[in-house]
Amino acid sequence: MFSHMAVMYANALYGRGFVAKGFEALDAIYQQSVDFETSRMYPGIPEYFSQRGRGMYPYLTGSASWYLLTLVTEVFGVRGELGDLVLMPKLRSEQFDEKGRATLHTLFAGRRLKVCYKNPEKLDAGEYGVGNVLINGQNITCTKAEGGVKISRLELMQLPDDVHCLDVVLREKK
């Protein structure tokens, strides 16, 4: 398996709404990479896996960066759009912890953000939408975007230089 293309394929699946298949592709790469007995690799994603499942050439790959890009922008759905922050999660129910949370730490517009999705009903991708968003415990006004919400860059730029908690409550689509 050529890892770089497999990750890009997963990215495209997520981008076109095939969340279950995208998850399956990313999870297969991850499971193969962490199976040291078979892959004979230190943790990481190699350029490709041989027919025996052995990882080959860990230093000739952009797979890990594409994997992370896919996790941030597609799975967690955290990305920029014309300077504003868009939150459009595609997390599967099994990706939330026992309390129904999934958290990502990232940078956006020079601000350190802790994005915590709260899925109290343990809904699967496609079953939920963004209900409300809080920054540091305060409700904020968001613009609805297809499949998520948009937060104004200006609102984020007014925040002091610190880590800011974005609590994103997911609700069943109606």
Language-model features: locations:
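Non-catalytic C-terminal accessory modules of carbohydrate-active enzymes
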Residues: M8-K174
